[in-house]
Amino acid sequence: MARRCEICDKGVVAGVQFSHSHRQSKRTWAPNIKKIKALVNGTPKTVRVCTRCLRSGKVQRAI
C-alpha cells in the first residue's frame, strides 16, 4: 500500500534522526493515512486520505 494521501499528495519523508550523543541514523516519517469510503463525483469510493485532510473537511465521507 502506498503511503501517500490521494487528496494532498502527502507522502513519506526521509531524514536523519539524532540521538543524545549526536549519533545519526537514517529513518523515514510516514503520514497518518486512513482508508475511508468517500464520495467521489457522487459515488462512494475507497480512498487513502491523511488525517489532516479528514479533519480539515477536504473529504466528504460516504455514509
From Swiss-Prot:
One of its GO terms (cellular component) is ribosome. Gene3D superfamilies: Ribosomal protein L28/L24. GO terms for biological process: translation. Keywords: Ribonucleoprotein, Ribosomal protein. GO terms for molecular function: structural constituent of ribosome. PANTHER family: 50S RIBOSOMAL PROTEIN L28 (PTHR39080), LARGE RIBOSOMAL SUBUNIT PROTEIN BL28A (PTHR39080:SF1). Belongs to the bacterial ribosomal protein bL28 family. This is Large ribosomal subunit protein bL28. It comes from Clostridium botulinum (strain Eklund 17B / Type B).
